[in-house]
Amino acid sequence: MDGLQYFSPERVADMVGEENVNEMLCGYRKSLLEALNKLSSALCCNQVEVIHNISHTMKSSSRFVGADVLASEFQKLEVATDNLTNVTQDTEFSISSINDQSKLLLDEINQY
């Protein structure tokens, strides 16, 4: 599929083989949706450590599928929550940005 903006199936294929791309994207999609739900809950409950850990995990997973913009957003959130004890306005903004970027990525994965 040409014209993909938010992820790179070629990168996934290079790592796991062309025949496994759909399975990997399916797993990533599920993980991302779960992470977004957990981020939302952690934000509401002021669970900074949970936000930090999810960000770290999803940064790596997003890079694996070539979702570099989203990986960068997760990395920013990971760094921003390092040594924080309470959620800040910046944390909320970062999570909002991640939600927006994730929607675009998920739409593209669904169309793939």
Language-model segments: residues:
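Two-component system phosphorelay core
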Residues: 1-53, 57-112
